[in-house]
């Protein structure tokens, strides 16, 4: 089963570009070039992100709860007046409908996000992992 999931995961790599994706309140191309892979079930989603250095996902919010786990290097998050620096092995929970900003500084980062319910912004296609197994 794991090999099927891995193949499905890797075959759905797409490049994130603001002109093709709509994040609420996002009016900049600063996150262009970030890549993600996504797989989803009926009510849960997992995304794997490769984010270049000096990338900014401007202040936004979404209905989904988000858990981010940093795999490599570091990511920065800000919500309200509070900023967080997450290094490899750190994770953060962002409740749904909370304004937040995410960015990298001098180095790229790699992270996994878990979403519930599915965040439609990062939906790759209509075929769920459950249908593939």
Regions found by a protein language model. Give the residues of each.
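Conserved short histidine dyad/triad with adjacent acidic residue
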Residues: 47-61
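Short acidic-glycine-tyrosine-enriched beta hairpin
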Residues: 81-96
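Short beta-strand His + acidic residue motifs that chelate non-heme Fe in jelly-roll/DSBH
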Residues: 59, 77-78, 94, 100-106
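A short, N-terminal "cap"/entry segment at the start of jelly-roll beta-barrel domains
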Residues: 1-43, 127-133
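Short, surface-exposed secondary-structure edge patches
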Residues: 58, 67, 82-85
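Glycine- and acidic-residue-biased ligand/ion/polar-headgroup-sensing regions
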Residues: 64-65, 69-75
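Double-stranded beta-helix
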Residues: 12, 43-45, 103-133
């Amino acid at each position: 089963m794991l090999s099927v999931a891995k193949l499905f995961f890797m075959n759905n790599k797409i490049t994130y570009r603001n002109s093709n994706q709509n994040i609420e309140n996002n009016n900049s191309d600063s996150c262009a070039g970030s890549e993600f892979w996504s797989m989803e079930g009926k009510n849960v989603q997992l995304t794997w992100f490769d984010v270049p250095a000096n990338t900014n996902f401007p202040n936004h919010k979404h209905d989904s709860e988000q858990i981010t786990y940093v795999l490599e290097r570091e990511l920065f998050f800000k919500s309200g007046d509070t900023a967080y620096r997450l290094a490899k092995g750190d994770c953060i929970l962002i409740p749904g409908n909370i304004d937040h900003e995410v960015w990298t500084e001098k180095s790229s980062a790699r992270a996994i996000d878990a979403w519930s319910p599915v965040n439609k912004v990062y939906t790759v296609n209509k075929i769920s992992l459950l249908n593939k197994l």
